[in-house]
Structure formats: structure tokens, C-alpha cells
């Protein structure tokens, strides 16, 4: 196995920069860079880091050696903690590149080696990647649970039950003349039925985990001049959309990302929807607005209080669903006692973006819907499409299984289900998917 290295921290100005070395030459590399021969495992040392050939000082740093298998990768590992300087990073990388039989690590290669050395399964490796990419508290909580082995435990539990079914069926196949109690077949049937129900229910999760990973798309729609762009600017806390009294100012979709209650939200401000427009560009904007609303996880439909009755049309009303927030804006311009027809059928928020009236109610409603769609449950949920694909495939094999068929063929259906689950966790040979998974890591991890 080759010895690899990389800067594990971000390249640039920082208090500390971290370099990781993994492989059989790790200790030798550390000795060459420091001139020190005796390193005890897991003990931190303060050392000068120099070019091995010239002796030129690179930095005064903290270094540590981890003897295999007690390291992140399971191999001999050395770590160097320098000052966070671009110049220091460049010099140390050059020094490492000049040492024979050591190379720069590929993206995710340290984590890949840890997986290959049985430090964790593939789901935990993916959890580490999600943890690095997490931008909100809820994304962090999901990732830390997965990195800690929660999905591995769930999938392995199903796999063990399936292996038990196989062992019972093989007893029937190998010893057909033996008097095996019917209770054994009853146990097979019960376990099989329970697993179908569990996996089916698990898949029927409305993509909660994937939504949390990728972000919930929120489309702001409504007639022209209702205050959609003003709402976007309020939510983003900066002016990213042009606000104007001229109808049709927003022509294309304007997007922004934010954190509401720990949930990642992808905001989309859209063109005002109206039935009559002779402007070809505005017509295309309206078409995109409607498409955005149809694919959104959450919708905010905004109306101008002064023009509400005249601006409601069937195209907008048809977009309302359980994850829609209806806002009546510019409420400061009408009598408080005025009741709108739409309020008889739908719950509406009365706000004034301009005068900061009831704006926190908007945030709370968004958070409530996000929590309902992607909030935590006791059972860890599917976090990416790879898991969902193989679980669906495994469930198909599981549903094909019946004791009325030839037992050898029936057992093969269970084996294929085991293989699908093993592909998720990495229990079986999954070389063809390792590159796809680990390429999404950063260099140094």
C-alpha cells in the first residue's frame, strides 16, 4: 500500500493548518521532516519542520504519530499542525513531494482506506461526507447520527434476519427427509412478512433525509407587485431582488439559500403570475414561476391586500396544497375589519413587509412545515438515492419470495435481497461504486 499525504484543512490563512500522512512510510516521513527518531504513538511533540535535504526551516509545528491499527485509516498515520499560511503549506507540500515513494492523496482516499480497513461501513463513510458538507444544525444532526453507525445498525439488523431465513431454508433443502417442525416454516413466513412491512414503511418516508441533505425548495409566487421580491430580501437580509411598483419587474427566477430553524431552505422568487400579458419574456417568466411552484417542497403565495379579490385566478388557487403558506401583504393599507373571501377557505397570514408587521409569523410557518417534512424521527432515515435504489431493488426480490415455489429458487430471492443491503453497507464487493462515493470528499479526507 502506498503512503499518501494531503492538507486536511482548508488552504489559506488560518490559525492552524493540518497535514495528514497515511501508509507504511508515515513514521519515516515524520522522522525525515523533524530529524527526530523516537516517536511514541499518540503523543504530541513540538518540532521544527525542515526540508530533509537542505535543512531549511519551514515552520515550528506540533506533530503526532498514530501506530496502526489505532488511527483514522487503520494504517500508520502522522499528522502535522503548522501555522495556517499559504507559504508554509506550499513549502511543506513541496518537501513531501520530494520524498521518494509518497504521493498526494486523491479526494476521499483517507476515508476510503479507513473503510477498506473495516473502521466503518459505507453508510458511515457517507455520513462523514455529509458531516463535512453540513451547513445547518439539522443537517449536522442527521450526518452525525449516520456517521455514528445508526444506518449500519438498522441495515445489518435486516441483513441478519434475512441470513437466518436462508439458514432455515437451507436446512430444508439439505435434509429433505428429516422431520423439521412446521414451526420453522412459520417463523420464515413471519420474518419475511415483517421485513416486507418494515422496509416498505421505511421507503415510504417522503424523502425526508434526502430533503434535509439537499435543502427544501421554497417558491414565492403570486400576482405582480404583491411584495414577493420584498419578502425575498427580508428573508435573505439583503437586497438580492429589485423592488419596483412596475408590474413584471421580476422576469426570471432569483434564488437564495438560508437556514430557518436549522433547516436548509432554497428560496426562489418568481415572476408575477397574471393571465393577461403581451410581453413574450414576461410570459416565459410566468411559465417558469408556475413550474417552480409545481416542483417546490414549500410554497408561499402572496397577495396585495388592496388588489386581492381582482388578482386571484384559478391558476394560482390550483397550486395550493398542505405545504402552502398564503400571505396577504400590505395589510397596513386596508381596514383591519375587512375580511377576504379567501380567508373563509384557507388560513392566511396578514403581514406588511414594508412596515415589519407579523414577519416572524412567516418564519415560524416555514419552520413548522420544514419540520413536518424533514424533522427527526426515532428511526434514522434514507439520506441518499443510492440507499433508496438498492432497498427498492431488495424489496422487489423479497416480494417475489414465496414458499410455494421451488425452495432453491425461493432462497435465491432472499440471497439477492441480502446482496442489495450488503451493497449499501459495503459488506459485499462494491469496488464499482467506491469511486463514485469517495470522489465527493475533499482532498485530505
From Swiss-Prot:
Stated name of the protein: tRNA modification GTPase MnmE
Keywords: Cytoplasm, GTP-binding, Hydrolase, Magnesium, Metal-binding, Nucleotide-binding, Potassium, tRNA processing
Principal place of residence: cytoplasm
Cytoplasm among keywords: yes
Family, as annotated: Belongs to the TRAFAC class TrmE-Era-EngA-EngB-Septin-like GTPase superfamily. TrmE GTPase family.
CDD domains linked: trmE (cd04164), TrmE_N (cd14858)
Chain residues that bind GTP: 225-230, 244-250, 269-272
Gene (UniProt): mnmE
Binding-site residues for Mg(2+), renumbered to this chain: 229, 250
Amino acid at each position: 500500500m502506498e503512503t499518501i499525504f494531503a492538507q486536511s484543512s482548508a488552504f489559506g490563512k488560518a490559525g492552524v493548518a493540518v497535514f495528514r500522512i497515511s501508509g507504511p512510510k508515515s513514521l519515516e516521513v515524520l522522522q525525515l521532516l523533524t530529524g527526530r527518531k523516537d516517536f511514541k504513538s499518540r503523543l504530541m511533540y513540538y518540532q521544527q519542520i525542515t526540508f530533509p535535504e537542505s535543512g531549511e526551516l519551514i515552520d515550528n509545528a506540533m506533530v503526532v504519530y498514530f501506530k496502526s491499527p489505532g488511527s483514522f485509516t487503520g494504517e500508520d498515520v502522522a499528522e502535522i499542525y503548522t501555522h495556517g499560511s499559504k507559504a508554509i503549506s506550499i513549502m511543506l507540500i513541496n518537501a513531501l513531494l520530494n520524498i521518494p515513494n509518497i504521493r498526494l492523496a486523491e479526494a476521499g482516499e483517507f476515508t476510503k482506506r479507513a473503510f477498506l480497513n473495516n473502521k466503518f461501513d459505507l453508510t458511515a463513510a457517507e455520513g462523514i461526507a455529509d458531516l463535512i458538507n453540513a451547513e445547518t444544525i439539522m443537517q449536522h444532526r442527521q450526518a452525525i447520527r449516520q456517521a455514528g453507525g445508526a444506518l449500519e445498525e438498522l441495515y445489518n439488523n435486516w441483513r441478519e434476519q434475512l441470513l437466518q431465513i436462508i439458514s432455515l431454508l437451507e436446512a430444508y433443502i439439505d435434509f429433505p427427509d428429516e422431520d423439521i417442525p412446521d414451526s420453522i416454516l412459520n417463523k420464515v413466513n413471519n420474518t419475511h412478512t415483517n421485513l416486507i412491512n418494515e422496509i416498505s414503511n421505511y421507503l415510504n418516508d417522503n424523502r425526508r433525509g434526502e430533503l434535509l441533505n439537499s435543502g427544501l425548495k421554497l417558491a414565492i409566487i403570486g400576482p405582480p407587485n404583491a411584495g414577493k421580491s420584498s419578502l425575498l430580501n427580508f428573508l435573505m437580509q439583503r437586497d438580492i431582488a429589485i423592488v419596483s411598483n412596475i408590474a413584471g419587474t421580476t422576469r426570471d427566477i432569483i434564488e437564495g439559500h438560508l437556514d430557518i430553524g436549522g433547516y436548509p431552505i432554497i428560496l426562489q422568487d418568481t415572476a408575477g403570475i397574471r393571465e393577461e400579458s403581451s410581453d413574450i419574456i414576461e410570459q416565459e417568466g410566468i411559465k417558469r414561476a408556475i413550474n417552480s411552484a409545481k416542483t417546490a417542497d414549500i410554497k408561499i403565495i402572496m397577495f396585495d391586500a388592496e388588489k386581492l379579490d381582482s388578482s386571484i385566478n384559478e391558476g394560482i388557487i390550483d397550486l395550493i396544497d398542505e405545504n402552502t403558506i398564503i400571505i396577504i401583504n400590505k395589510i397596513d393599507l386596508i381596514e383591519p375589519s375587512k375580511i377576504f373571501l379567501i380567508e373563509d377557505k384557507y388560513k392566511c397570514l396578514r403581514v406588511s413587509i414594508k412596515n415589519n408587521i407579523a414577519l416572524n409569523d412567516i418564519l415560524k410557518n416555514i419552520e413548522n412545515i420544514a419540520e413536518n417534512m424533514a424533522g427527526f424521527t426515532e428511526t434514522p432515515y434514507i439520506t441518499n438515492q443510492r440507499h433508496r435504489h438498492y432497498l427498492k431493488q431488495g424489496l422487489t426480490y423479497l416480494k417475489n419470495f414465496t414458499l410455494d415455489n421451488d425452495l432453491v429458487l425461493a432462497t435465491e430471492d432472499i440471497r439477492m435481497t441480502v446482496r442489495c443491503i450488503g451493497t449499501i453497507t459495503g459488506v459485499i464487493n462494491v469496488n464499482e461504486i467506491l469511486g463514485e462515493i469517495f470522489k465527493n470528499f475533499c482532498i485530505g479526507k
